[in-house]
């Protein structure tokens, strides 16, 4: 594993891991924090919290590397991705593979400090991270796999805290899948024309002219499931206000994507960071109050 770590190469690795674009890490972080706060409840151990926060960053970076590796033959034909490190030649295929291995090993070393159940679940997390980028070649539902990959930290968090996977865990996991399909469809709407030309599949293409309607239905599903989690765990009204604020953000996103303009769809996608934040704040304040 020989690398020439020049400043330009380090910058290329930085871009390949998307450390300059934290939105993906944040969309992975919020459900992880939801799970830790519900599982504890409201008082996660500092070390477990640190392991999951660091693990989120490492696995998101690894996911970006394997995603670009899988798409390296396609990205050169898409306006938004033509200058990414792999299609531009700033990073070689071997360097990308090596970087992926290093990131995954670091994440696994962190997981090894947790219990056996969490370690076993981490194997599935790796499988999902590896499989997702290739799904867009074979199915119009890669966003479902993305939702499972981004949400797998939820059962891992419950396992790390209690070595159990209660109903709230799976409801939250399902809510995260619905949310991920909604926001990644918004993201896919940005590249829809290019994806059709080069044969990449997505829910944005599958949903067609019903895209905004289906996104809205998915968003309602997220709100219903998150409200049910609140009821099951006896959370206070502050949490339900947070769910309503998240709903208002979804309405705003619907307004943005109504005309299906690229910049507006991307703005709607980015707005989901606030959805995750608001729901976490609702959980944190509810547990703090009690």
Curated annotation (Swiss-Prot):
Membrane-crossing ranges are 23-43, 46-66, 99-119, 141-161, 163-183, 212-232, 233-253, 268-288
Q: May I have one GO cellular component term?
A: plasma membrane
Note in the entry:
A mutant in which deletion of the last 50 residues is combined with the 'Tyr-56' mutation in rsmG is highly resistant to streptomycin and has a small colony phenotype (which grow slowly and are resistant to aminoglycoside anitbiotics).
The UniProt entry, under NCBIfam families, shows:
ubiA_proteo
User: Which lineage ranks, top first, belong to the organism behind this chain?
Assistant: Bacteria, Pseudomonadati, Pseudomonadota, Gammaproteobacteria, Enterobacterales
Cofactors named for this entry: Mg(2+)
Report the protein name in the record: 4-hydroxybenzoate octaprenyltransferase
Q: Per the UniProt entry, what are the Gene Ontology biological process annotations, in alphabetical order?
A: ubiquinone biosynthetic process
Q: Name one Pfam family in it.
A: UbiA
List the cysteine pairs that form cystine.
none
Substrates-to-products reaction catalysed: all-trans-octaprenyl diphosphate + 4-hydroxybenzoate = 4-hydroxy-3-(all-trans-octaprenyl)benzoate + diphosphate
Q: Which organism is it from?
A: Salmonella typhimurium (strain LT2 / SGSC1412 / ATCC 700720)
Query: Which EC class heads this enzyme's classification?
Result: transferase
